[in-house]
Regions:
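Intrinsically disordered, low-complexity terminal regions
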Residues: 1-158, 162-177, 181-242
Length: 242
């Protein structure tokens, strides 16, 4: 995108996110007491999807032995909820947490199909997540950082959120909008289908085929010397090789 467009888009997004974060800090909420404890919680039902929100941190480990452990300030422990409904592990807080020494949830899971992170939450993998298909969604300033090995990977980032990927996949489908970033330059893909709009950025590493569309100040960068390229850039969008 042009320098002027990038400045305008970045400024608007920064002001919106600052306003949101400022409001959250001034609003009512509970602060941690600094005494961090662990709580290993029972897993009552099977799940292969994870949804996390409200600024909590989730560390995922692929393991044949499922487990669920919360590490948090003692007075915040009962506020951090971990419910399993219809195959989805929902991780959230029952009240606003203003400050915490720790608000971490450690999840060991054998297989995972979907991860959704919202409202400033952070999700990262502690080892390589090896599955056939995986769907990732981020919004409202949330972050996902994963190392993966998949055949089919779908990513969607909106509203100033970020997805960072490494590893390998056969097919990558990625969409980013509203100032979000998808950094997949360390993810080796054979085929990539990507779309960036409204000031979003996507970087990919693809070897065989790339279909890329950038509009409204979106920016797509690619590496890997794909054999086939189909690219479209309009309305100050940009598709370029790194």
């Amino acid at each position: 995108m042009t320098t002027l467009t990038r400045i305008i888009v970045t400024s608007i997004i920064s002001m919106l996110m600052f306003s949101c974060n400022f409001s959250m800090q001034l609003g009512e909420g509970v602060s941690g007491n600094g005494n961090v404890i662990k709580d290993e919680r029972p897993i009552q039902n099977n799940f292969d999807k994870i949804k996390v929100s409200q600024g909590l941190d989730v560390h995922i480990t692929q393991s044949s032995t499922p487990s669920l452990t919360v590490e948090a300030d003692e007075n915040l422990m009962d506020l951090i909820m971990t419910d399993i409904e219809d195959g989805t592990l929902k991780i959230y807080s029952s009240e606003n947490i203003r400050r915490a020494t720790s608000k971490k949830v450690l999840v060991n899971v054998e297989s995972i199909a979907s991860i959704k992170a919202t409202s400033g939450s952070d999700v990262l993998s502690k080892n390589t997540i090896a599955v056939d298909q995986l769907e990732l969604q981020t919004t409202s300033g949330a972050d996902i950082n994963l190392d993966v090995k998949t055949n089919h990977l779908d990513c969607n980032a909106t509203s100033g959120s970020d997805i960072t990927l490494s590893g390998e996949t056969t097919t990558l489908n990625a969409s980013a909008t509203s100032g979000s970033d998808i950094n997949a330059q360390h993810l080796k893909a054979e085929t990539s289908n990507v779309k960036a709009t409204s000031g979003a950025d996507i970087s990919v590493n693809t070897s065989k085929a790339l279909t890329a569309k950038a509009t409204s100040g979106g920016d797509i960068r690619y590496s890997g010397n794909p054999e086939k390229i189909d690219k479209t850039d309009t309305s100050a969008g940009s598709v370029r090789q790194e």
